[in-house]
Structures are given as structure tokens and as C-alpha cells.
């Protein structure tokens, strides 16, 4: 018996919608990363993108434990000398709440072309509305 390897053209991808209201950021992000990679499927193959599309709603209502709401800091560098910038979790939620979930999930995906392809299947929205009704997403309870 030969080992089954998924082919990119035969992978069936489903669309799911997740409500992030009250969900803990890290626990939500790990499950999203797992499903974007396709590890929940029997035909999972490490070098093939077998994951599903995921729509996350209410990103502005995601929860963090402890004092992370005030203490957690996101850093990025502009590329110029002395150009390190920092933004707290509260400021990030106020400015761009989608980015909080995107950063958490992106760090859990593989680095490289395959990981970028997986990340493109994640759609995050701050509010309760999305424009993917034509794909008929199923509700996923995490």
C-alpha cells in the first residue's frame, strides 16, 4: 500500500466563519492556524496547502488574559536608524483590531511561500459584517 499524498488540484477547501467575541487571543489563533494548515484533515500533507478558508468576525472584541490588555506591546522597525516603533495592545485594538489576530496567526504559520499562501486564506473583520456570503461559509464554533 502506498502512502497517500494530497495533490494541490484535488484539495477540497471549505469556508468557515468564526466569531471572536470573548475568545482568548492565543487559543483562538492556534486553532485558526491549525485549520489554515489543514492539520484537522485526514489528507494533511506538510508540503501541500490543504487548509480551509476562515473568516473571523468581531476581532475588536477578542479577549486577552491577565494584564496583557495594557502591558502587551507590538514592535516593528521602519528600517531607518533608531526607527523602532511600539504600539500597545489597547492602541492596536483601537486603531486596527484585525491586525491583532493576523499577527498572532501569522507567527504560528510556516515561514516561506507555503505559509504566505496559507495566511492569504484568513479574512479578519473588526465588525460583524463580511462580504463572503457567496461562498456560503459554515459557522465554526471554537
From Swiss-Prot:
Pfam families: Ribosomal_L13. PROSITE patterns: RIBOSOMAL_L13 (PS00783). InterPro entries: Ribosomal_uL13, Ribosomal_uL13_bac-type, Ribosomal_uL13_CS, Ribosomal_uL13_sf. Gene3D superfamilies: Ribosomal protein L13. Keywords: Ribonucleoprotein, Ribosomal protein. GO terms for cellular component: cytosolic large ribosomal subunit. The keyword Ribonucleoprotein applies. GO terms for biological process: negative regulation of translation; translation. Part of the 50S ribosomal subunit. Belongs to the universal ribosomal protein uL13 family. This is Large ribosomal subunit protein uL13. It comes from Shigella sonnei (strain Ss046).
Amino acid at each position: 500500500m502506498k502512502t497517500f499524498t494530497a495533490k494541490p488540484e484535488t484539495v477540497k477547501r471549505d469556508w468557515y466563519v468564526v466569531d471572536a467575541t470573548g475568545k482568548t487571543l492565543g487559543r483562538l489563533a492556534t486553532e485558526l492556524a491549525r485549520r489554515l494548515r489543514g492539520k484537522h484533515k485526514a489528507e494533511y500533507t506538510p508540503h501541500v496547502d490543504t487548509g480551509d478558508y476562515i473568516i473571523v468576525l468581531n476581532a475588536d472584541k477578542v479577549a486577552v488574559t491577565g494584564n496583557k490588555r495594557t502591558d502587551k506591546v507590538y514592535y516593528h522597525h521602519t528600517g531607518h536608524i533608531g526607527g523602532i516603533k511600539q504600539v500597545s495592545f489597547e492602541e492596536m485594538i483601537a486603531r486596527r483590531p484585525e491586525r491583532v489576530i493576523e499577527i498572532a496567526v501569522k507567527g504560528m504559520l510556516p515561514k516561506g511561500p507555503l505559509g504566505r499562501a496559507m495566511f492569504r486564506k484568513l479574512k479578519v473583520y473588526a465588525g460583524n459584517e463580511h462580504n463572503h456570503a457567496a461562498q456560503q461559509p459554515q459557522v465554526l464554533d471554537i
